[in-house]
Curated annotation (Swiss-Prot):
SUPFAM superfamilies noted in UniProt: P-loop containing nucleoside triphosphate hydrolases
Protein name as catalogued: Phosphate import ATP-binding protein PstB 1
Source superkingdom: Bacteria
Topology class, membrane: Peripheral membrane protein
Organism: Streptococcus pyogenes serotype M12 (strain MGAS2096)
EC class: translocase
Family of the protein in this entry: Belongs to the ABC transporter superfamily. Phosphate importer (TC 3.A.1.7) family.
Binding sites annotated in the UniProt record for ATP: 39-46
Annotated Gene Ontology cellular component terms: plasma membrane
One Pfam family in the UniProt entry: ABC_tran
Keywords, ordered alphabetically: ATP-binding, Cell membrane, Membrane, Nucleotide-binding, Phosphate transport, Translocase, Transport
InterPro entries tied to this protein: AAA+_ATPase (IPR003593), ABC_transporter-like_ATP-bd (IPR003439), ABC_transporter-like_CS (IPR017871), P-loop_NTPase (IPR027417), PstB-like (IPR005670)
Length: 253
């Protein structure tokens, strides 16, 4: 019996200044899976990711057609509350971006925006979120130190904890390890594999090894087209498209 998808993208196109940069993409995300989005720079991976929680709305030169259905509703409906949407569909960026405040305040930032002031609720959220991001033991004795003073890898895990604190169902990650050293990147990967037990994840990555290690499904993008999508093992062992095979084998990138 096939698992029902948690989010359905249908015929999604994105235009920047009337130039079509994402072309009629259809893709599903499935619960408790990691989907990797691979392809050369400028192929549309990050554009798709930013469309899933409407980050592209912040650019007035962007036009979007098609649909993304989550919880039975098209997220591009005028009735969609984008603040609530981004709590349900969180995002972690390429460069760690902790706010210039304490580790504690970074994690509870979204909760405070929701009006939560109860210290016991905030304390519990901080501990559970930092544990979820696999960094609690490293920072539990310095929660009121500035998050900016942490290493790059620790900062990125605090950013993951900040997303977890709002209780999302889907976590989007845009090359979350590309700015990190290999050891820090490895810790992030271990964290993501643990998180997929409770969340749905989609990750943009330039590393074929990372996509192979982490993901259950992979989508290959080229010049705005989703050329191929399917189970990662099958795609890496027997890609259906020559372009996919050439990219995975490093013939272009």
């Amino acid at each position: 019996m096939m698992t029902e998808s948690i989010l359905q993208i249908r015929d999604l196109s994105v235009y920047y200044n009337q130039k079509k940069t994402l072309k009629d993409v259809s893709l599903d995300l499935y619960p408790n899976e990691i989907t990797a989005l691979i392809g050369p720079s400028g192929s549309g991976k990050s554009t798709l990711l930013r469309s899933i929680n409407r980050m592209n709305d912040l650019n007035p030169e962007v036009t979007i057609t098609g649909s993304i259905v989550y919880n039975g509703h098209n997220i591009y409906s005028p009735r969609t509350d984008t603040v609530d949407l981004r709590k349900e569909i969180g995002m972690v960026f390429q460069q760690p971006n902790p706010f210039p405040m304490s580790i504690y305040e970074n994690v509870v930032y979204g909760l405070r925006l929701k009006g939560i002031r109860d210290k016991s609720i905030l304390d519990h959220a901080v501990e559970s979120s930092l544990k979820g991001a696999s960094i609690w033991n490293e920072v539990k004795d310095r929660l009121h130190d500035s998050a900016v003073g942490l290493s790059g890898g620790q900062q990125q895990r605090v950013c993951i904890a900040r997303v977890l604190a709002t209780s999302p169902r889907i976590i989007l990650l845009d090359e979350p390890t590309s700015a990190l050293d290999p050891i820090s990147a490895g810790k992030i990967e271990e964290t993501l594999l643990l998180l997929k037990k409770d969340y749905t994840l989609a990750i943009v990555t330039r590393s074929m090894q990372q996509a192979s290690r982490l993901s259950d499904r992979t989508g290959f993008f080229l010049e705005g087209d989703l050329l191929e999508c399917g189970p990662t093992k099958a795609m890496f062992m027997n890609p259906k498209r020559k372009e996919t095979e050439d990219y995975i084998s490093g013939k272009f990138g």
